[in-house]
Amino acid sequence: MMNSPATRYMLFSTGGVRYAVNVDYLDEISELLQEYPIPQAPRFLRGVVNIHGKLAAVFDLSLYVGTGPVKKGCNLLLLKMPETSLAIVVEQMERMIPGDEIVSIEQGAGPSGATTFILADGKAELLDAEHLVDSMENSFVA
């Protein structure tokens, strides 16, 4: 069940939008590291970073969804994915919440048509990490 106490989510915001990601997809949270650009990559793909000897693509989620580039003072959220290493640029880390803090769930209510969590202190759009990677890969093919 999505809102069981055993399921935990990390809350963060970027581009003026608040997100939640299941911690099962999180590998690490890091300060912004030296980025190396990728020639001819889309604007939302800022480059790659070296995290513990492993290269990860740096993804600007706010540029991707159209809310503008992230501001200064950012963190990286390194996602744990089976076939790729992806680091999302995040403007503000909030906190980790247990699933039972979710008051209600609205399907298809977020800015991107995603699931929205209603919390006691506001809303958060659920970030589907697998869907994000798939849609990012499809943007290279198009």
PLM regions: where:
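An acidic, low-aromatic, low-complexity terminal/linker signal
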Residues: 1-142
